Amino acid sequence: MSNGIKVKKRNGRGMEPLDLDKMHKMVEEACKGLAGVSASQVEIQSGIQFYDGITTEEIQEILIKSASDLIDLDHPNYQFVAARLLLFSLRKSIYGKMMDLPDLENHIYNCTNIEVYDKDIFTKYSKEEIEKANSFIDHERDFLFTYAGLRQVVDKYLVQDRSGGGVFETPQFMYIMIALTIFAEYPKERRLNYVRRYYDAISRHRLNIPTPIMAGVRTPIRQ
């Protein structure tokens, strides 16, 4: 269903009708399982801000802001609605979809190919070790974030193009890459166990990471 508004596609190639049904399903997904929240309330708050020629990124930001504006003492779960909407937008911008993310090897390959990850990761670890590390990743842990927490990670810590604004990783890929980089020089027979345990601790937010490590340890600048 459309209301006549034309939307500029994310890839910049042409316009398409605003799909209200698709938007509703996404907001419903962001509200799923959370008490005291309403997809309709988020949509009502945001709907009057749409205009002809709006981009899909702008629509997403409007929805995120609408959900975050609803956060108060009586409705704290909107902080998770806003976080989920931000996460959906992040995944869509990086991978072109919200679910079914790439495996770790493909993700690392893409990021080393554009020189945002340190290419030495492929000399430090074998293909089999990277496949094993991939099995440690739980992308559902992205949904543990509150909106404020995820916004800080997106704005300050995820590997990105600071001039162009593109982001190249999601939180779980950030966490596993931090763990792999930190333990790369440890004995091979034990290091994957350390990687798994450290990844579990930081991805569940049980352990704080110093800013230089969180922001840069997996990149070519290595700090």
Regions picked out by a protein language model, each given a short descriptive name:
Residues M1-Q223:
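Extended catalytic cores of very large enzyme megasubunits
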